[in-house]
Amino acid sequence: MIPTYMNIMLAFTISLLGMLTYRSHLVASLLCLEGMTMSLFIMTALIASNTHSPLINIMPIILLVFAACEAAVGLALLISISNTYGLDYIHNLNLLQC
């Protein structure tokens, strides 16, 4: 396997392990989730550059749009939780339900 792909897969795996390890704090979970989406973006961009199909060239852009949306929703949740409770624990997300 090409070392570039191995490094990107390693970055995704480390972000996934970080997500599983630091799942109590929202900031750490959001950072790990952002690392996972960035490694997926780089992987799809590399695959799109290697295959010269016009249909796959749009996939990195679509993934980047979804990453921006999840970052915006995550930051909105972080702000609402930290303003309400003063902490960024994920178990406070259950308290936001009506």
Swiss-Prot record:
Q: Which UniProt keywords are listed?
A: Electron transport, Membrane, Mitochondrion, Mitochondrion inner membrane, NAD, Respiratory chain, Translocase, Transmembrane, Transmembrane helix, Transport, Ubiquinone
Gene3D superfamilies linked to this entry: 1.10.287.3510
The highest taxon in the source lineage is Eukaryota
* EC numbers on record: 7.1.1.2
Please give the Pfam families that the UniProt record associates with this protein: Oxidored_q2
Membrane-crossing ranges are 1-21, 27-47, 61-81
Subcellular location field: Mitochondrion inner membrane
Query: Reaction catalysed?
Result: a ubiquinone + NADH + 5 H(+)(in) = a ubiquinol + NAD(+) + 4 H(+)(out)
Q: Which GO terms describe its molecular function?
A: NADH dehydrogenase (ubiquinone) activity
Q: How does it sit in the membrane?
A: Multi-pass membrane protein
Matching InterPro entries, A to Z? NADH_UbQ_OxRdtase_chain4L/K, NUOK/Mnh_C1-like
First-tier enzyme category under EC: translocase
Which terms under GO biological process does the entry name?
A: ATP synthesis coupled electron transport
Q: What GO cellular component entries does it have? A: mitochondrial inner membrane; respiratory chain complex I
Q: What does this protein do?
A: Core subunit of the mitochondrial membrane respiratory chain NADH dehydrogenase (Complex I) which catalyzes electron transfer from NADH through the respiratory chain, using ubiquinone as an electron acceptor. Part of the enzyme membrane arm which is embedded in the lipid bilayer and involved in proton translocation.
Tell me which family the UniProt entry assigns to this protein: Belongs to the complex I subunit 4L family.
**Record text on subunit structure and interactions:** Core subunit of respiratory chain NADH dehydrogenase (Complex I) which is composed of 45 different subunits.
Name by which UniProt lists this protein: NADH-ubiquinone oxidoreductase chain 4L
